[in-house]
Amino acid sequence: EEGGIPIGAALFKRDGTLISSGHNRRVQEDDTSVHAETDAFRRGGRRRDYPDCVMVTTLSPCWYCSGLVRQFNIGAVVIGEAQNFHGGHDWLSELGVEIVVLGDPACTELLATFIAGHAELWNEDIGL
């Protein structure tokens, strides 16, 4: 609806308490760094409890966002789908980050439809 990439993310405490949420606003803000995960991370403010946090995201995090998870030692990542884009979650898993891929059909369809209709914008988002 806003004309951007339909990916959202949220940062939670392990007990389920929402810390912050965000979405990909790269197009809306003309800023290539505003991916969903980075938006949620920034909105969460300064913290010292990242190992006890969970990042939940529509799609497997790209390398940029995977680096953020690694840099700040976020303890777990829950991924809506990894079929349309695999991202860096295998690397994060190898480093000890708990990874859960839900394989949610709604997320898969949402992204597949978006990619089919906006291939140039999508390729720009993932660095192609």
Q: Residue spans of the language-model regions?
A:
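Short, basic/aromatic recognition patches
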Residues: 1-4
